[in-house]
Structure formats: structure tokens, C-alpha cells
Amino acid sequence: MKKWINILLLAIAMMACENTTFVSSVPSYPVQMVINILGEYPNFVAEGGINVLTFTAPRYPTEAVGYAGLLIYTAFDNQYHACDLCCPKCLKRSAPVEWDGGFYAHCPTCGEDYDLSYGLGIPTRGISNERLRPYTALYGNGRLTISQQ
């Protein structure tokens, strides 16, 4: 009897576990880009404030820019961040989010604004319930490497 109670409790505990891994609704496409910050974009520095680079197409045959393109930016944490230009609510490659010149990326289709200031790309208006699809941004030796997470 004690054995069955333990098995039942274990089964209940396993069913109560929830997978909390973030899965984006934006389709997974290859992402690979290496940017020579010092040589190509010397003013794109991660020092206090938001700076943005966008790429809707690869610059070289060896690069890949995700589903709708890359939004590469710096945030208040003085780190480099990257995400896909596709709005996770609309999923339109032909209408990527656009940087507003301040702290937000705006979707021209649904009107959602995504906050870039803390490096998360989170929705602010409640239209979308999902952040922009994040990518890994690693900086070292003057080079910024963007890849899948």
C-alpha cells in the first residue's frame, strides 16, 4: 500500500511540472553573423544608451539573418543584444519591426511596441503576449558574433 501511495505521489508531482523553456512563435531560421565592431561600426558601442543596427539580408554568403532579419542593439546594461525583426504576433516577414529612434521597436502591422531598454524586447501595449525572438550576442576582441540561442 505504501508503495502505491509513493508511486501516486510521484506521478502527481511529475504532472505538476511545467516546461518553462521559452519557445518563440517566430519560425526558427539560421542565424550567423560576425561583425567587426572596431572596423565596420566604430560608433556602435555598448556604453550607456541604445544603439541599433538592423540587417534584413546577409552581407556575405556565409551569413544568415534569421526569419525576418536581425535587430542588433545595446541596452542600459551596456551589453549587446540581438533578436529577430519579426513581430511574434503578426509573423510577417514583409513587415518587420522598426526601431523608433528611442527605446522601442514598433510593429507597423499590429501596433505593438517592444521595449529594448533592458535587452529583452518585451511587448508594452498588451497586443502581443510574447517577446521578440532572442538570439545570442557575444562580444570579444572587437568582434560581435550573433547566433541561435
What is each stretch, according to the model?
Residues 100, 105-108:
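Flexible, solvent-exposed short loops/turns enriched in glycine
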